[in-house]
Amino acid sequence: MSNIGKNKTDFLRQNDSRNFLFLSVVDVIKIKDFDYILIENVPQFLKMKYFYDGKLLELTDYLSAMFSDKYDIKVNVFNAKYFGIPQSRPRAIVRMYKKHLTWNEPKEQREITLKEAIGHLPSLESGEISNLKHHKARVHKESHIECMRYTPTGKSAFENIVYFPKKENGERVKGFKSSYKRMKWEQPAPTITIRSDAISSQENVHPGRKQADGTYSDARVLTLRELFIVSSINPDWDYPEEYSDTFIRQIIGESVPPKLMYQVVKGIK
């Protein structure tokens, strides 16, 4: 299910064909005799409505009407940050399993902060490269770098009095305080999106550290290594060489942290 752009309203969600791919899953469940079934999507997925026996039902009621005679059905929204992943990423998880079987709830864990997860990695500025695999900073516009150097940890450059986001003519850029924003060391990372390459997108900038001159270090987005860590992906992953930095970031932005799925499926008995 898409959670951006034209999917922001209930009406438009109901009229976007992509959001009905779920019905193909239902068709497969009808044909096959699975013991366990896992369906995953964004939390808004649970608000979708489908026709059953002439009635328009929300997803949970729809599945219950279709399959409750054969399966126990559990519907939850699990946030990755409560399951050992240093990223806030809520996901809708539907678990279906035959009535004689067991699927236990995943056990919550304490939150892991960004400081714990990536605070040990070398500081990098735009375009710099470290000796660690995948720990290479993207190159950013000088105007973006300048305003982020004067932006404290956890703050947006839109809050700056002098060094705020500007157009080439010096005019202030219009935008939200969720963009041009640094992350917070003492919290998990925010949800990683497909635009983790852009300083101007949502809360993508490294937390940084205050320097002796009053500016802040690491005026850049997270490196791939940092993104892998906060997404519970092996930071030394050998992905295909033909895949670009941008493409890998898009994959991560569309993905589910593998450790979250592991915590869910290990409850199968």
Q: Which residue stretches match the model-derived regions?
A:
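C-terminal target-recognition/interaction regions appended to catalytic cores
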Residues: H140-K269
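Class I S-adenosyl-L-methionine
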Residues: S2-S179
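Short acidic/His/Gly/Ser-rich catalytic and metal-binding motifs that mark active-site loops
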Residues: M1-I4, K47, S201, D238-P240
